Amino acid sequence: MIEYRIEEAIARYREYYEFKPARESAGIEDVRSAIEHTNLKPFATPDDIKKLCLEARENRFYGVCVNPCYVKLAREELEGTDVKVVTVVGFPLGANETRTKAHEAIFAVESGADEIDMVINVGMLKAKEWEYVYEDIRSVVESVKGKVVKVIIETCYLDTEEKIAACVISKLAGAHFVKTSTGFGTGGATAEDVHLMKWIVGDEMGVKASGGIRTFEDAVKMIMYGADRIGTSSGVKIVQGGEERYGG
């Protein structure tokens, strides 16, 4: 069934796909409300995370994305706000055992995470081990029912058909979003990848663009081509760029 769905999606892509913006423009509030203000650096300190959370509150970002060890701290810093706490699982390689990813997700939610960004097993995807990839994602989704799960497909390592397969499997496995990149690979988000991913998953799933998004113009372009969320460590700079353009 999985292989059939992938082949069906590839055939549809070959016949009907057209690269064009999903919307004509995006304003500063569209960008602000899409940003997941991110610090996943291996040398991030508690003070860095406190600063990240303060900036997210002040700028009314959608959320913060932090390493698992800082979920509890971020939850405390954001108490009483609408800012979501997002963390990562199987990060950044995606090569952990499935049960490890599932337990990581459980512990993250117990610590206060609202959303989970898990890394797909890139090697198994490239080997066309569809069932493995499906079960890997499904196990995380099932382990934290009721929480949003995003699947990082690491587009920089995939060809077009592999990107399509990753999106199809993520959707079948019950994930809520597909995400372009970890930010630790050889490349980040592109409008072309974002558009393809949204075209494949449709309106039933979201797309998170992440990796290399540093300016207001970058963020607007990603949203215009289908991104629902923006993962970036440059959230403040991005919003300041929008304010300079539009005022306030």
Curated annotation (Swiss-Prot):
This is Deoxyribose-phosphate aldolase. Pfam families: DeoC (PF01791). Pathway: Carbohydrate degradation; 2-deoxy-D-ribose 1-phosphate degradation; D-glyceraldehyde 3-phosphate and acetaldehyde from 2-deoxy-alpha-D-ribose 1-phosphate: step 2/2. Catalyzes a reversible aldol reaction between acetaldehyde and D-glyceraldehyde 3-phosphate to generate 2-deoxy-D-ribose 5-phosphate. It is an enzyme of class 4 (lyase). The lineage of its organism: Bacteria, Thermotogati, Thermotogota, Thermotogae, Thermotogales. The gene is deoC. It catalyses: 2-deoxy-D-ribose 5-phosphate = D-glyceraldehyde 3-phosphate + acetaldehyde. One of its GO terms (cellular component) is cytoplasm. GO terms for molecular function: deoxyribose-phosphate aldolase activity. The active site is at 117 (proton donor/acceptor), 179 (schiff-base intermediate with acetaldehyde), 208 (proton donor/acceptor). It comes from the Bacteria. Its EC number is 4.1.2.4. Belongs to the DeoC/FbaB aldolase family. DeoC type 1 subfamily. PANTHER family: DEOXYRIBOSE-PHOSPHATE ALDOLASE. Its main location: cytoplasm. HAMAP family: DeoC_type1. It is found in: Cytoplasm. GO terms for biological process: 2-deoxyribose 1-phosphate catabolic process; carbohydrate catabolic process; deoxyribonucleotide catabolic process. It comes from Thermotoga petrophila (strain ATCC BAA-488 / DSM 13995 / JCM 10881 / RKU-1). Keywords: Cytoplasm, Lyase, Schiff base.
